């Protein structure tokens, strides 16, 4: 692979057409961008597109402008500000990492960043190159797609992570790693998009094996889709005589850790959904309820499963609510939710 010409072509394209207005990439008075802002942005970008992240990042930086401010924040404040971005464990790990980084110099090597909660190899490489102009490779979705097309790789990239990391390391401009990594991401985000890649404007068109084959949109090769399993969740909106509803806070570990919810759980095989609600609320909160009327049914899909939430209104019969499978429980007025 002619890495020298490829690097020169991409950087020349990026100098003229790249996304130069990303706020966390802007230099401060010192001439360098803020490592804190870059770290926050890179974690937000792990599962979320740039245009979605931008307003969240702005609000975050206003609320927690420094590592010290984030470290001192209450976890519920952190989760509330993250609300809407999803994958809430990212916010919790940022909070934990801030408490580790507080009062310390910024890490300058890959191993130190990987030792922090919520930081993988690509995120660490992106922080080191973006914040400190260090020559570390990245391999996010955009870069993986660009490399798969450049080489017309005939297998799903997820099965060949080591191969793509080798390619990314080989194809890294060590004189301008900050700009080059951003250029790779910009190329994937603006020209070599998942659908309808804009090959005529691509600086790598003459070197691209997928373009030469006449089918760039067929790369990267996709895994055969597997049907997602469906789980039905019975949920109870429990009312007491004061008109309050019962909510509980999930354990920190696992999906949606630390968030508040109406209580409920998985339907067992052969079980009526009303029986699911009664059983789950007894097992998890030590209360007895009467299921009265259905309220709503909602479907939601994750990458690995589908969930159907079947929600019923319930009357509180007996038992003082206890957090047997959660952090805490609380009666609140509906207007305070």
Please give the residue ranges for each predicted region:
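NUDIX/MutT-family hydrolases
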Residues: 313-337
């Amino acid at each position: 692979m002619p890495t020298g010409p490829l690097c020169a072509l991409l950087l020349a394209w990026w100098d003229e057409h790249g996304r130069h207005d990303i706020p966390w990439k802007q230099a401060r008075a010192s001439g360098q961008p803020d490592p804190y802002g870059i770290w926050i942005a890179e974690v937000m970008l792990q599962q979320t597109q740039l245009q979605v992240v931008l307003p969240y990042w702005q609000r975050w930086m206003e609320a927690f402008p420094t590592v010290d401010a984030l470290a001192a924040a209450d976890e519920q404040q952190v989760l509330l500000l993250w609300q809407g971005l999803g994958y809430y464990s990212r916010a919790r790990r940022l909070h934990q990492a801030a408490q580790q980084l507080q009062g310390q110099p910024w890490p300058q090597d890959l191993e130190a960043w990987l030792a922090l909660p919520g930081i993988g190899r690509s995120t660490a490489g992106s922080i080191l190159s973006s914040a400190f102009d260090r020559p570390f490779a990245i391999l996010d979705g955009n870069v993986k797609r660009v490399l798969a097309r450049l080489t017309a790789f005939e297998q799903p990239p997820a099965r060949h992570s080591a191969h793509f990391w080798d390619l990314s390391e080989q194809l890294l401009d060590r004189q301008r790693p900050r700009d080059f990594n951003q250029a790779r991401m910009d190329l994937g985000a603006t020209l070599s998009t998942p659908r309808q890649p804009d090959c005529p404007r691509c600086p790598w068109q003459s070197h691209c094996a997928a373009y030469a084959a006449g089918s760039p949109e067929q790369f990267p090769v996709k895994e055969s889709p597997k049907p997602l399993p469906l789980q039905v969740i019975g949920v109870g909106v429990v009312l007491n005589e004061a008109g309050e509803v019962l909510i509980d806070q999930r354990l920190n570990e696992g999906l949606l850790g630390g968030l508040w919810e109406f209580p409920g759980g998985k339907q067992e095989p052969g079980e009526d959904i009303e029986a699911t609600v009664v059983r789950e609320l007894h097992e998890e909160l030590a209360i007895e309820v009467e299921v009265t009327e259905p309220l709503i049914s909602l479907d939601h899909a994750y990458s690995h499963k589908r969930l159907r939430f079947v929600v019923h209104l319930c009357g509180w019969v007996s038992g003082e609510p206890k957090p047997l499978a959660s952090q805490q429980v609380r009666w609140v007025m509906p207007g305070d939710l």
